[in-house]
Amino acid sequence: FGISIEPTNFSKYDFIKLPYTDCWGVLMKKDAFLASKEYINPQDLKDLPLICSNQDLVRNELSGWLKDDFDKLNIVATYNLIYNASLLVDEGSGYALTLDKLINTYNSTLCFKPLEPKLEVGLDLVWKKYQIFSKAADFFLKKVIELI
């Protein structure tokens, strides 16, 4: 089982849409000039050194939010794992476009600021198609279905 962030290509997976969402925003140092803002808008991102996910679906999602070409942004690095991007942010290398609940900023030098207008994504529980489940996995899936 895994948790997938929409949009997702489900051609290889079965899934259950979860009743939860997460929102996009910017991970930055607490002393960054944008850290005092409550929200980050598209204009705020112009010319900033950005660290972005290297997934094409993410780029498409953010292009729609920007109402502009994603390639016009000043992308200085890409990431597969947000933890690695958070290390770059902590070193002052840029600002990471990411989801809210992936990096714990409590007691750290980093903070998260949501995008405005708000950009939310759905979450799905996914598993390989035609999967034969163990008793424990089968029980887990039935319990998730029961709870949602």
Regions found by a protein language model. Give the residues of each.
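Beta->alpha turn/N-cap motifs
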Residues: 1-8, 29-30, 81, 97-102
